[in-house]
Each structure stands twice: as structure tokens, then as C-alpha cells.
Amino acid sequence: MAVVTVPDKNLVLRDAEEIKNYLAAIGIDYERLESEPRISPDAAPEEILAAYAPEIEKLKATGGYATADVIDIKPETPNLDGMLQKFRPEHWHDEDEVRFIVKGHGRFHIAPKNGDVAAITMEAGDLIRVPRGTHHWFDLCEDRTVRAIRLFQDTAGWTPHYTSSGVEQKYS
């Protein structure tokens, strides 16, 4: 299950309901899907998408998402550090960022316009929706592994708009 940390308040949340409520208050949707995977997290991307098709179709219908894919990041990913340099600076998107973790761990930092930065450490079974325009950044956890289903409203996919604020340097 996710863990939410708010460093400036010295706050750590581990309870699913507290996490959901706290994140909702800063505009982030969080859900915990089944804890037992219905397919191997190492399955082919098309098998993962098929296994989670009911959830994907529901999200597409309610959020206007046009497409889904599977991102697979691991320590041996070619140019991993270069890839992470695109995710780590604070940025925002013209569309929602939706991620469902199927393997590994990742950490989203959310920088609300009128609130404290919150770090959401996610693991398999965690689903997050970061609304369009929300300032945030992402990094891997210690295992440097994450496999996630991503949903997009625009078939062109993930396009960041960097803020150049440097705020991420205080929290990384």
C-alpha cells in the first residue's frame, strides 16, 4: 500500500482511508486495487493490459482516456538515468497522469498550489490520478524498478511542461 509523506509537516500516512482523504484534499485521486495480482507482473505488456481490461475500460469511460500502455523501468533499462532526468524536474501536463503500479515502487511528489509538498510512495496495487495542470515530479525508489499501466487522453502520450522552479531539489 502507498505511504504518503509530507516533510514540511513531519507527517507520514500509512492508513488507506487517511491516504485517500488527504490526497483527495489536494486534488489527487488514489485507489488501492486488489492486493493479489491476477497475472504475473513479469507478463508481456499486452497480457497485463488484457488482465486489467475491466479497470482500464472503466477509467477510459470516466476519464476520457484514449489509450493505455505498460511502462517497464528496471536497473538495466538502457539510459535509465537519462530517462529519469525527464521525470525528476517539477513539471505539469495538459492531461491527467494516471498510473497503476503492477510491480516495483515509484514516488510521486505533488506540489499543490496552496499546500505542502507530499510524496506518495507507491507499490503494486496502487492507482493514482494526477489531474492536468498539477505540479509534480517522479522518481524511482531504492529498487529502481517500476512497471505500471499508464493511461492517456491524447494518443501522443506523455508531454511535460517544466516549471524550472527547482523545488524538487529540496525534497529529492
Segments and roles (model prediction):
Residues 1-65:
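N-terminal leader/capping segments at the start of a protein or of a new domain
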Residues 5, 32, 69-72, 150:
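Structural signal for conserved beta-strand scaffold positions within catalytic alpha/beta enzyme cores
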Residues 70-94:
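Conserved short histidine dyad/triad with adjacent acidic residue
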Residues 92-112:
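Short, conserved beta-strand element in jelly-roll/cupin
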Residues 114-116, 144-145:
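Short, surface-exposed beta-strand-loop junctions and turns on beta-sheet-rich folds
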Residues 122-142:
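Conserved metal-binding segment of the jelly-roll/cupin
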Residues 139-172:
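Double-stranded beta-helix
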